Amino acid sequence: MKNNIDISIITVGMNHKNFLITFLDSLYNKYPPYVSFELIYVDNCSDDGSVDFVKSNYPQVKIVQNKSLFGFGENNNRGAEIAVGKYLAIMNPDLVFLENSLNSLFDFSEKLQKDVIVAPKLLNADKTFQHSVRGFITPWVFLARFLTGGNDNTKNKTVQNYLCKNISIDQTQFIDWAIGAALFIKADLYKKLNGFDPDYFLYMEDEDLCLRAWNSGNAVVYYPSSQIIHNHLRASKKIGKKMFLHFKSLFVFFLKHGIFLTSKKKNSPITLPGN
């Protein structure tokens, strides 16, 4: 049977009911896209009534309800398994869609001659620009981040370059990678890349996916014409737990790609529309 769904939106939640209320309202009521879509909600063992809220208010949503905890990447993979859309929109529940957020991602991707991962422009709640684009990690970046205490506002040039603080925020451009809060990818490419690597429980899985996209002859693009508010979901994990997960994922990343990783970014044959 022919598939008529343009976009499968996948969102993963764990006790994020308050975020889901705004997320779903912006998607279904305030700014519903003109393209056809489905929403897949993957619930990671919530106990705050998230599932009941979705079932009661948005019965059209597909729900994957975990009986045990899974990591961010694996949860998105579980959602992708039942997705039927031409494109997958990996979207955190702490997002708020604006007018044409999804329409523009779809239209832009349709114009490209090759499959890419597209990252929209993320905004803070006050509509100011939120830095979500990154450079690939290196031992020097890791050391600089460690020595500066993870401060995003440090004047350290290595950190500033890693955080792409000098990016032209209104220019469509190739990037190394973008945070996994909002990524748009053709389902065929996601399948080709085998989705997110489940070896990462949390952190680094988005960078890993983007690196593999580059190395498979595809690309990652920042597309600022699509804008989405990102309310910065704050995990309840203690600092020690978060640091442990960061270090563990970093170890997996370097073990997989090497300490001095290489990418095929510069060899991409893809031309961006208007460039």
Where are these regions (language model features)?
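Short aromatic/hydrophobic "clamp" motif used to bind/position activated sugar donors
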Residues: 88
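Short, flexible, basic/aromatic active-site loop/helix in glycosyltransferases
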Residues: 137-175
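Active-site-adjacent helix/loop segment of glycosyltransferases
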Residues: 118, 208-275
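A short, conserved alpha-helix in the catalytic core of glycosyltransferases
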Residues: 168-170, 176-227
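Glycine-rich, basic loop-to-helix element that forms the pyrophosphate-binding segment
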Residues: 66-83
